[in-house]
A protein has these predicted regions:
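C-terminal nucleotide
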Residues: 49-201
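Gly/Ser-rich oxyanion-binding loop with an adjacent helix/lid
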Residues: 1-67, 199
């Protein structure tokens, strides 16, 4: 999207619009119920913080930080996992979180105070199920963690940033449950890759 924007539109399309176009292509053309986070990060590049409270007008703020200056590099590992047949698994994540929001008569979880969520936990478990509850716990914790991560980078406290990122990873694994697809026993490629990375690093 960014390349096409520069080649054919004189870079006049905003980064948010490039991300929204990418999301539309995935949702409509490829039939994948994705959000805007990956598309926004790709459109902007480098490190960014994104506020999706207004999904039509996300607030995108670059975070000026050089990983190399701390002796680190961001690496992508080929775990061998194939998510071609996991559309329903990925769709279940926002679907279950929105189901909890709907319990409160709202569209998205950001419209519900965390205290109200925990106050109604027994009823939510009965209505929406435990996995939905766990995913909402991740949602609230992660939304609290992100500003701390950004602040740590801006303060130059890279060790604190890494610690918070590690917490995010564990939360994704434990609460969001996006590492091992439901029912997969023999093939858990991403989990194996995470285990080996933790062992060697």
């Amino acid at each position: 999207g960014t390349i096409i924007n520069h080649l054919f539109f004189e870079a006049k399309v905003s980064q948010a619009e490039v991300a929204q176009i990418g999301q539309y292509a995935e949702n409509v053309f490829f039939g994948k119920p994705c959000g805007l986070m990956d598309q926004t990060a790709s459109a902007v590049g480098n490190l960014v913080t994104i506020d999706f409270f207004d999904k039509e007008n996300p607030v995108i703020e670059p975070v000026d930080f050089d990983l190399a200056s701390c002796g680190h590099a961001l690496c992508i590992i080929d775990s061998g996992a194939d998510h071609a047949d996991l559309t329903d698994e990925y769709a279940a994540i926002p679907g279950e979180i929105k189901a909890v929001a709907a319990y409160f008569g709202k569209e998205v979880l950001t419209q519900i105070d965390e205290k109200d969520f925990y106050a109604k936990l027994p009823e939510i478990r009965k209505t929406c199920g435990d996995r939905a509850v766990m995913r909402c716990i991740h949602f609230y914790q992660e939304n609290a963690r992100v500003p701390q991560q950004v602040a740590a980078l801006r303060e130059g406290n890279f060790d604190k940033f890494l610690s918070l990122v590690k917490q995010s990873g564990y939360s994704s694994y434990m609460y969001l449950q996006n590492v091992i697809p439901a029912g997969y026993k023999a093939h858990q490629d991403v989990a194996v890759a995470l285990g080996l990375a933790e062992h060697y690093l």
